[in-house]
């Protein structure tokens, strides 16, 4: 039984962690931190957790959490995880950070896009990017795992087989992605209000979204050369879910059937990545509440381009479910433990 603590437990990703870990047979939650809800029961903050946790949120220092826990999840805004993770690694405690602070092998890229100093370039270079389907073996031996962003998870899983196999021109990739409102977090803001989001869809972060360099870093590693993408996210009036539709030019003619075989081979044995049958395109509601990624693709023979669609739940495979998948790998548990649930549908 592993003792785990969550720093920043009352945001959406923190609450999703509690939901999943409350049914994990090898994890004991020993600390939930929150400044805003200190002294309140977690089930009072999120009544959906009633009957699954009796823990109280506490305003603890990171060291106080580490005194109790063998592994910590950090679910804080970017810029806050560096000192916490640095201290945890000094104490030999495993860390899974759900924010952006450790996702870049070169911390200068982080500083350029997030406009803040990093604080520990050396440790950033040693952190493992926590996408199990790509970095499984490195995650097993990692002490610090950088949980991927939600958009990058969807995009990388969608494009990895094509780039690894050299089937597409890396200079032609377009990623059109759409996310539910929970991706913006729980903090109150005008753009997340019901009357602002409902019956509307809009692009944001055009040509400037901070997930762009994260996507490019991982796709470049897969391709073995520099990859630059055009990435445009959109806000959907749904609670959770991401649908990414990706386009790229083929370097040689290929059929849909040939590329389907490439995907089937690449993801053979993967418990959470599923290539749907021909003609059945991913729906966000099919992965709602699950750690699954649904994929499909088709070749447009008129234009010589391939179209790939990828759907995930932004809070589960795009955040907390993937964090638990990483925990399982780091601790030697079955990778699917506490995660084997289908999407909620309808």
Swiss-Prot record:
Coiled coil: none annotated. One of its GO terms (cellular component) is cytoplasm. The keyword Amino-acid biosynthesis applies. It is found in: Cytoplasm. It catalyses: N-acetyl-L-glutamate 5-semialdehyde + phosphate + NADP(+) = N-acetyl-L-glutamyl 5-phosphate + NADPH + H(+). Its EC number is 1.2.1.38. Gene3D superfamilies: Dihydrodipicolinate Reductase, domain 2, NAD(P)-binding Rossmann-like Domain. Pathway: Amino-acid biosynthesis; L-arginine biosynthesis; N(2)-acetyl-L-ornithine from L-glutamate: step 3/4. GO terms for molecular function: N-acetyl-gamma-glutamyl-phosphate reductase activity; NAD binding; NADP+ binding. SUPFAM superfamilies: Glyceraldehyde-3-phosphate dehydrogenase-like, C-terminal domain (SSF55347), NAD(P)-binding Rossmann-fold domains (SSF51735). Keywords: Amino-acid biosynthesis, Arginine biosynthesis, Cytoplasm, NADP, Oxidoreductase. Its main location: cytoplasm. It comes from the Bacteria. InterPro entries: AGPR_AS, AGPR_type-1, NAD(P)-bd_dom_sf, NAGSA_dehydrogenase, Semialdehyde_DH_NAD-bd. One of its GO terms (biological process) is L-arginine biosynthetic process. The active site is at 150. Pfam families: Semialdhyde_dh, Semialdhyde_dhC_1. Belongs to the NAGSA dehydrogenase family. Type 1 subfamily. Catalyzes the NADPH-dependent reduction of N-acetyl-5-glutamyl phosphate to yield N-acetyl-L-glutamate 5-semialdehyde. This is N-acetyl-gamma-glutamyl-phosphate reductase. The gene is argC.
